[in-house]
Amino acid sequence: MAVDSDYVTDRAAGSRQTVTGQQPEQDLNSPREECGVFGVWAPGEDVAKLTYYGLYALQHRGQEAAGIAVADGSQVLVFKDLGLVSQVFDEQTLAAMQGHVAIGHCRYSTTGDTTWENAQPVFRNTAAGTGVALGHNGNLVNAAALAARARDAGLIATRCPAPATTDSDILGALLAHGAADSTLEQAALDLLPTVRGAFCLTFMDENTLYACRDPYGVRPLSLGRLDRGWVVASETAALDIVGASFVRDIEPGELLAIDADGVRSTRFANPTPKGCVFEYVYLARPDSTIAGRSVHAARVEIGRRLARECPVEADLVIGVPESGTPAAVGYAQESGVPYGQGLMKNAYVGRTFIQPSQTIRQLGIRLKLNPLKEVIRGKRLIVVDDSIVRGNTQRALVRMLREAGAVELHVRIASPPVKWPCFYGIDFPSPAELIANAVENEDEMLEAVRHAIGADTLGYISLRGMVAASEQPTSRLCTACFDGKYPIELPRETALGKNVIEHMLANAARGAALGELAADDEVPVGR
């Protein structure tokens, strides 16, 4: 029996809002995260609560919406809403979600607006009356072509008041449609070879948990073991938190099916590993492990290499919490300059669905960080941050530290200059908004960015140094946001950005062909 995702959403129904407009300044000027997925098959366990805790561990990967789907062998039940995991779920809701298999999702939008309809897991009924729920981390580069296919099969609405507009919903629709004539597992094996882009999926029916990873393995996905079941998660830290032991990474191009018969593994594509190097720099939790490499250890090593590449005389090294802290520790260890905690972070500042007032917006970074004046007053500071995107955050930070008494500010960045947008699951700004694109010449660019943020000196780690710190071969990493070398060809519709499906549905509602921009032509992505 399939149960629609509206089933337990009375509390949410009154707040099916679209979040648009300006986000707080600190969110606009950082690389914005992607999503987190979690799944568990464990008869006899409270799978809804395990999923809740797993999503808590993955909250850093997406703060716009959260959802959980559970099944007990007879029905699939989905609850989702806008907000943080702790805001969406309470004890009463979790207690109502009984079953032996569950998936969960925390969302940051990379395709589709922030609406209730676009929250995940997405849900679809099959023609056989069963249910399919799906969660997705990543971004599809052929979403428009898949949407055209779904529209032609009558699977997506173009004129209803608020259709879902994500590549994830398209995948859910096509999976459910394929399962009408075969098993869900076979439907996935038929569909996945036609999907292009970065994707880690968890999906389920009434009895079985499925998980898969795209052939490039752009985003991480791991398998863990419970005493009475199995867990899959975007990061190994989530396995630790729910008490699961790490088994292995799910391989690029691999589909897992987990049920009473155990774990089945099937290859749907040959692997061509291209893991996102930015996971090591910023996206992943420091207590996670990716491809056998500790994220924390990688960040500390980046800091050491940064100290060797960009030395400077100073009195104190401080990190911009949280992701800049391990690199700052490594910089201090290598340089011999003492490390200190110079900035306090407000742990309760996150993304908000309340539009900030002009007064609050002007506070900017002060809402998030505050200097320890007694630590930094009179000091020559080395300030280590994970990345520079637009530069507004670093400009405000430098100004704040000078006002607090720092006499020199030497900014060091634990990643190379970001010059290219990401089409594989990170919501970077357009090329024109990236500060490192202001000047073509590398030396002139460095001076222009230094001047723009107001630092005394500025240094970035080299691409070679960052890659070496990951301990992964360059050939197995995606570094496109730094060098423009995209491992997955980009169709024409990628120029439409995250609202590609909204754009195409609007065209369809006006009578235009849904697939007219779905050509598979590779297009150059300029700065």
UniProtKB/Swiss-Prot annotation:
Reactions listed under catalytic activity: 5-phospho-beta-D-ribosylamine + L-glutamate + diphosphate = 5-phospho-alpha-D-ribose 1-diphosphate + L-glutamine + H2O
Propeptide feature ranges: 1-34
EC number: 2.4.2.14
Domain Glutamine amidotransferase type-2: 35-261
Keyword DNA damage: no
Record's cofactor remark: Binds 1 Mg(2+) ion per subunit. Binds 1 [4Fe-4S] cluster per subunit.
Annotated InterPro entries: GATase_2_dom, Ntn_hydrolases_N, PRibTrfase_dom, PRTase-like, PurF, PurF_N
UniProt feature, compositional bias: Polar residues: 15-29
PROSITE patterns referenced in this protein's UniProt entry, alphabetically: GATASE_TYPE_2, PUR_PYR_PR_TRANSFER
Binding site for Mg(2+): S323, D385, D386
Catalytic residue positions: C35
Annotated GO MF terms: 4 iron, 4 sulfur cluster binding; amidophosphoribosyltransferase activity; magnesium ion binding
Essential cofactor(s): Mg(2+); [4Fe-4S] cluster
GO biological process: 'de novo' IMP biosynthetic process; purine nucleobase biosynthetic process; purine nucleotide biosynthetic process
Matches recorded under Pfam families: GATase_6, Pribosyltran
Region (Disordered): 1-30
Pathway(s) it belongs to: Purine metabolism; IMP biosynthesis via de novo pathway; N(1)-(5-phospho-D-ribosyl)glycinamide from 5-phospho-alpha-D-ribose 1-diphosphate: step 1/2
Keywords attached to this entry: 4Fe-4S, Glutamine amidotransferase, Glycosyltransferase, Iron, Iron-sulfur, Magnesium, Metal-binding, Purine biosynthesis, Transferase
Binding site for [4Fe-4S] cluster: C276, C422, C478, C481
Functional summary from the UniProt entry: Catalyzes the formation of phosphoribosylamine from phosphoribosylpyrophosphate (PRPP) and glutamine.
Family: In the C-terminal section; belongs to the purine/pyrimidine phosphoribosyltransferase family.
Protein name: Amidophosphoribosyltransferase
Organism of origin: Mycobacterium tuberculosis (strain ATCC 25618 / H37Rv)
